[in-house]
Amino acid sequence: MKHRRYKLDDSNLLLSSPCAVASCWYSENPATLSPPRPRHTMPASVHFEISATQRAIKIKGPGQASVEKGCPVPACQPEDILVRVVCVALNPVDWKSADLSPSLDATWGTDFSGEVVVVGEACQSRFALGDSVCGAAFGNNPEDATQGAFAEYVAIPGELVYKIPPDISFEQAATVGTGLATAGLTLYQTLGLSWPDQPVQDAQYVLVYGGGTASGCFMIQLLRLSGYIPVTTCSAKSFDRVKQLGAAEAFDYHSPGCGSEIREYTENSIKYAVDCITNIDSMKCCYTAIGSSGGQYVALDPFPIRGHTRRNVKARWIIGYTIYGRPINWKHPFKRDAQPQDREFAKRWYPVAQRLLDEGKLQLHPLQVETGGLPGVIEGANRSRKHQVTGVKLVYCV
């Protein structure tokens, strides 16, 4: 197989060391990822000069975005690091939030990987220039138009960033941020389940509806590490993969009796269900699967109220951006007050998740590396809107 190597455009970044110039691999077959590239931490003497402007994807209206030049580079606060973006990945929340509550001229995008080029004063004990990192930015932010990952630079609190282990490439790392944060917030903060470093002794079944999604992929693995027994739904073609991740059993969501089948398999014992899909059919399946004594249902999107058919089931939905501890001033139903308790949770969760990544205990979601850079992201989002992307995350080198 042929591969092409493209250097990132470094016209706005002056480096005192030539080895600091990042690069990306593109495969002639976009479904295949090349082996991880070696990365190096820069010596302390390395100096980065950052241009005042950058290219970024800006939201122009519902379903509309464009790549713009001359955009300001986000300011790096004492608690932040500034990252030169190498790769970005698309999530459903990117286009859903921009379609339903667009913040005009805000930078778009959530998941990224890249290299640290500025370290805020409060982060200097943990990060150095040139460190390889990944995370989830607060894109489409109505309060700060410079935030967002679909750009050449992103500023993000150091507490909300993972260092990339040596055996994970920038392309792979770009798929981690949103899924791992959402999985942790759902399982441990919202449902209150036992953490991986203190696994439960009395194993219980937990339903993950949508085990083929990126968040579902992480949830299945985290539940196993936490001592639970995950069962999941997905398409039949994904059965082998979700079982390899740790699912005790997989059920075809196309089956009209899916919920009843799960309830029978788990002997009427399920108390916890997570809905990674969130529509009337997925909610009905989860409510049917939850045992007769009731339980908790958590969705990753606003759920249809008409689907809340059981009084003994507590239903909630979460939005991952609450880990920033700031208000989410989007339109209803996405608008949220600041959740400082979620920020405190994130401060505890990220070090635990970092250890799991470092120890190789988490498999990452399948990805498809696309060409086209930032303009390609817009085209990929349009494909995702039309449900033309399944089972993989689209990744782009910037």
Swiss-Prot record:
Its EC number is 1.-.-.-. It comes from the Eukaryota. It comes from Aspergillus flavus (strain ATCC 200026 / FGSC A1120 / IAM 13836 / NRRL 3357 / JCM 12722 / SRRC 167). Keywords: NADP, Nucleotide-binding, Oxidoreductase. NADP(+) binds at residues 93-96, 212-215, 235-238, 253, 300-301, 389-390. The keyword Oxidoreductase applies. Belongs to the zinc-containing alcohol dehydrogenase family. One of its GO terms (molecular function) is oxidoreductase activity, acting on NAD(P)H. Monomer. It is an enzyme of class 1 (oxidoreductase). SMART domains: PKS_ER. The lineage of its organism: Eukaryota, Fungi, Dikarya, Ascomycota, Pezizomycotina. Disruption phenotype: Impairs the production od leporins B and C or any other potential open ring 2-pyridone. Trans-enoyl reductase; part of the gene cluster 23 that mediates the biosynthesis of a family of 2-pyridones known as leporins. The hybrid PKS-NRPS synthetase lepA and the enoyl reductase lepG are responsible for fusion of phenylalanine with a hexaketide and subsequent release of the stable tetramic acid precursor, pre-leporin C. Because lepA lacks a designated enoylreductase (ER) domain, the required activity is provided the enoyl reductase lepG. It is possible that the dehydrogenase lepF also participates in production of pre-leporin C. This is Trans-enoyl reductase lepG. Pfam families: ADH_N (PF08240).
